[in-house]
Structure formats: structure tokens, C-alpha cells
Amino acid sequence: MAKLALIEREKKRARLAAKYAPKRAELKAIIGDMSKSDEEHYAARLELQQLPRNSNPTRKRNRCAITGRPRGTFRKFGLARNKIREIAFRGEIPGLTKASW
């Protein structure tokens, strides 16, 4: 199980990303708009740099909902591979069967 602080850090990153998403999108639109002047581009870039680092959605890491494991997490289930295996063998995920060929 991952440390609780790491799980809470990821939750904080998700909250910050959601909070600053409109502002970040607005600034990126100004930066990408070629009809704006160089001064406006520069001002928007400086303002974007002033936003918190953790408000950037690329810093968010997907973690297992049960264990908090950061690697081997399936997006579809939100669980790590080993927890998917345990739960699937108990038959708790509908429609999921063991592969055989």
C-alpha cells in the first residue's frame, strides 16, 4: 500500500488542475493566437508561469483506488493489475473472464 501522503498529494494535484483549468486554457489560447501582439503573448506566458506547478494536469499520476499503487494501473477500472486479478478471480467484475487460447 502506498503512503497516505502520496495519495493525498495526487488528490491535491487533481483539485488544483480542476481549479486552474479555465485560467490555464484562456492563457494558452492567448499564447497560441497569432493575431495578438508580442507583448500580449509575453504577458500571458509570464502569467502562465506564475500558476502553481501542480495545477498542470500532466503532473497528475493515475493510482489504484484500493492500494494507491502508481504503476500498472488500468484506466478502465482505476485499479492496479494485481487487484484486478484478485477481484476478477472472485467474479466481482461482470463480463471479465480469464483468457485462454
From Swiss-Prot:
Pfam families with a match to the protein in the record: Ribosomal_S14
rRNA-binding in keyword set: yes
GO molecular function ontology, one term from the record: rRNA binding
Gene Ontology process terms (BP): translation
Tree of life domain: Bacteria
A single cellular component GO annotation: cytoplasm
Entry keyword set: Ribonucleoprotein, Ribosomal protein, RNA-binding, rRNA-binding
NCBIfam families: PRK08881.1 (NF006477)
Stated family: Belongs to the universal ribosomal protein uS14 family.
Quaternary structure (record): Part of the 30S ribosomal subunit. Contacts proteins S3 and S10.
Function summary: Binds 16S rRNA, required for the assembly of 30S particles and may also be responsible for determining the conformation of the 16S rRNA at the A site.
HAMAP family xrefs: Ribosomal_uS14_1
Name of the protein in question: Small ribosomal subunit protein uS14
